[in-house]
Amino acid sequence: MKTTKDFWVMKNEGKKIVMITAYDYPSAKQAEQAGADIILVGDSLGNVVLGYDSTVYVTMEDMIHHGKAAKRGAPNTFIVADMPFMSCHLSIRDTLLNGARLIQETGAQAVKVEGADEMIPHIRALVRAGIPVVSHLGLTPQTAAVLGGFKVRGKDGEAARKMLEDVKECQEAGAFALVLECIPKQLAQEISTNLTIPTIGIGAGVHTDGQVLVYHDILTYGVNRAPKFVKAYANADQLMLKGLQDYADEVRSMNFPDDEHSFTMKEEELKTLYGGRG
């Protein structure tokens, strides 16, 4: 399993970091088999697998439940678990308790915290307590509703300068890596050049130190409409739907189960069953 130090080495050597967002045992298992460097158990599970229209409905219990499953599927991969909405906003004490729960109860190696500004003391406290932190800036889904919705961040000069300040504060607070979501590729490149910690982009261009996409988006699995920054590498929906339809057809036509998928009794046992009748 890689460590935080390994990710810094990868940045310095120009080796790209592969992060895959996965929410359960089978998806995390496949991500590990594919050679992912990091698996993110994101609160986007609210949208992707729980059917919510926002991540704000995801609870600590949800994150722990899915984090434990993902860890069982990928025991040898570095796992990052999201701090869900309001789990690190009320007090430093609450932040530490929730961060500790995520690490202890899921087996994750780190937590991810959205935002800067008022979140800086919380990031610093987590790191001082021995909990590795990934910061998340740009489009931050937990606060999208109050920041103008789901759109690209940092497109004007003032917003870009503010983000440059924010990422440096996150680094100084002790974050060991940074997720950059939906920002101009030029800004992402500038940030990546100016930071010593690795950057992982999602909708942030090719010049970040790594990339992250959601398992379901990569495979076109259960997603209705993918964002612009998503590239699908397979169409699992078509394959799975065909399999389910074939199953239903064979049940109705009595072609399933056939002898290959059925069990039998010995002839003498059948006689016992039938009371000696032939």
Swiss-Prot record:
Keywords associated with the record? Cytoplasm, Magnesium, Metal-binding, Pantothenate biosynthesis, Transferase
Task: Supply the Pfam families for this chain.
Answer: Pantoate_transf
Q: Which Gene3D superfamilies match?
A: Phosphoenolpyruvate-binding domains
Annotated 3-methyl-2-oxobutanoate binding lies at D43, S44, D82, K112
Q: Which InterPro entries match?
A: Pantoate_hydroxy_MeTrfase, Pyrv/PenolPyrv_kinase-like_dom, Pyrv_kinase-like_dom_sf
- Subcellular location(s) per record: Cytoplasm
| Any one GO molecular-function label of the UniProt entry | 3-methyl-2-oxobutanoate hydroxymethyltransferase activity
Give the protein family.
Answer: Belongs to the PanB family.
Function noted in UniProt = Catalyzes the reversible reaction in which hydroxymethyl group from 5,10-methylenetetrahydrofolate is transferred onto alpha-ketoisovalerate to form ketopantoate.
Subunit field text? Homodecamer; pentamer of dimers.
Return the protein name: 3-methyl-2-oxobutanoate hydroxymethyltransferase
- Origin species, per record, is Desulfitobacterium hafniense (strain Y51)
- Its gene name is panB
